[in-house]
Amino acid sequence: MKRRTFLRTAGASVVGATALAGCAGNDGTDTESAGTGGFSGTLQVATYSSFTGKDTAGNWLKSIFEAAHPGVTVEFTTPESGLNQYILRQQNGAEIDADLYIGLNTAELVRADQELDESLFETVDEDLTRADTVKSGLQIDPDGRAIPYDTGYISLVYNGNEVENPATFDALTSEEYQGDLIVQDAGNSDPGRAFLLWTIAEKGPDGYLDYWRDLLDNDVTILSDWEPAYNAYMNDEAPMVVSYSTDQVYYHGEGVDIQKHQVGFLNDQAYANPEAMALFADADAPDLARTFMDFMLSPVAQAEIAVRNVQFPAVEGVDPGAEFSQYAYEPSEPVTFSYDELSGNVEGWIEDWRREIAN
């Protein structure tokens, strides 16, 4: 059994959902942290859809960075197949039409390294002035290519009017919670994959499939991704869903039944899923991309990313504000797998899960 890694500091992960990403932060216009210089041209940034658009972290970063660099335009692209698009392009010898990738997790980085002969990304940690401010427990790449910018904790969200927090993994398989849980497909969904890895950390590579068979016997619902799963939960199709421990950051205030947005940790744990950014090795604007990455690690940007992405900052000493801190929950025992632990294992775990459980 692979050793599981416990994080001792807060972190962040991608929400990966349109609803949560629309949570707006402060309307600050401080451009100092974005740097200055003689840059001009276009920075092409590949990311996920909910990072861009009105009131999102991406739109705020673009506005502030362009104001600090009048000759620069930041353009976002949202590849339908995510990182897989760029893995396939490199395998086929096609041009990588982006400078920077935002939204990379550990499992995706491992997959890219396993499937490609040459690295898709460039080492940058020694080139960034703020790279050493990232919390040490969040680092996902031993080669310094992928730099975390936020982290989330995968947990349960449950309706306290209907059920109590199960508190343990074993409780989820009991008759008391039969038919009560909605999860996501681990092959298609970031939170679904994180929850699968959490069960592997708890039950071990030799026991996790038996645990999932017990979940199936207890009528767990498996849906394709976070959004349909959360929508089903909000439509009262089941009183529990795998989601994020920052749920109440978005869902609180007048008219909101906060009991429907209770955060549940299993065995006092949640799965930490840091989200990272990485410079493509064949980037057309590498220096501009590095400057943008440093800006994303600045305290002002980190606070905005936390609130707008509804995730925890990746950098030490950042305060997202009292409201965020009141409603964002951190587990006493975060758990995750490291790059080395996932390397050579994660794809097999997912394929076995697909074959034995999802089918």
How should each PLM-predicted stretch be described?
Residues 1-19:
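N-terminal secretory signal peptides and thylakoid transit peptides that target proteins
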Residues 23-34, 38:
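Bacterial lipoprotein signal-peptidase II cleavage site
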Residues 38-110:
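Early extracytoplasmic/lumenal segment of secretory-pathway proteins
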Residues 48, 55-56, 97-237:
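Extracytoplasmic ligand-binding site segments that recognize negatively charged/polar headgroups
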Residues 107-111, 240-259, 309:
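A ligand-binding cleft/hinge motif common to bilobed small-molecule-binding domains
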Residues 152, 213-216, 222-223, 256-281:
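Periplasmic-binding protein-like
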Residues 270, 275, 280-337:
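Mature extracytoplasmic/periplasmic domains
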Residues 322-359:
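Extracellular/periplasmic bilobal clamshell ligand-binding domains
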